[in-house]
């Protein structure tokens, strides 16, 4: 595992923000998939501020989501809504560069629509960069232990939270694994035990999707703060 440890979550987020600047200056549009959760909120707030808000060529970045809950964008549970509030409302970015999962739609209709958009915009299915989180149960995106089909050939899937039953749409494991780069952004001491388990146990012996999903032809790295990394 490629673990990179930062003193704090803010340091990890600053590194990602610096890399957004680099991606925005490529000679082709860069397709980046975002994650929900508390640490990404820190990232979005950082990107919306100086110097990044000015340094990044937002026209060259296309944003997608690893997953989203089937709620309206105004709902506090919406991953897209969070980014809109913390980042998009504060920068100049073309509307066509934002490829959200439309949580207000009927799930099966939206699954079909979202997969069609993915196919049309990223015809080879290869993302430049996918940023993922990891739950304390080892889930990533909305791919949960004991209910993820790692061989699903579709681009996206309807998922149900194992406890709340909440419906989401998620990228499939196979689509994520085609990315040029995957960065797991994991912070806080609440993740220390599971990171230790992932480090010390072969992935095939674990139920955790975050332990099993990696870039098949690219780079996979884990950005951790020192609290998350304390048992490694």
Curated annotation (Swiss-Prot):
The cross-references to Pfam families, in alphabetical order and at most eight, read: Glucosamine_iso
- If you read the UniProt record, what top EC class would you report for this enzyme, in one word? hydrolase
Write the Enzyme Commission number(s) for this entry: 3.1.1.31
Example GO biological process: carbohydrate metabolic process
Listed A to Z, the keywords are: Hydrolase
The pathway this protein participates in, as annotated, is: Carbohydrate degradation; pentose phosphate pathway; D-ribulose 5-phosphate from D-glucose 6-phosphate (oxidative stage): step 2/3
Report the catalytic activity. Answer: 6-phospho-D-glucono-1,5-lactone + H2O = 6-phospho-D-gluconate + H(+)
Which GO molecular function annotations are given, in alphabetical order? 6-phosphogluconolactonase activity
Q: So what does this one do?
A: Hydrolysis of 6-phosphogluconolactone to 6-phosphogluconate.
Q: Which PANTHER family does this one have?
A: 6-PHOSPHOGLUCONOLACTONASE
Tell me the protein family, please. Belongs to the glucosamine/galactosamine-6-phosphate isomerase family. 6-phosphogluconolactonase subfamily.
Protein's recorded name: 6-phosphogluconolactonase
Q: Which organism is it from?
A: Aggregatibacter actinomycetemcomitans (Actinobacillus actinomycetemcomitans)
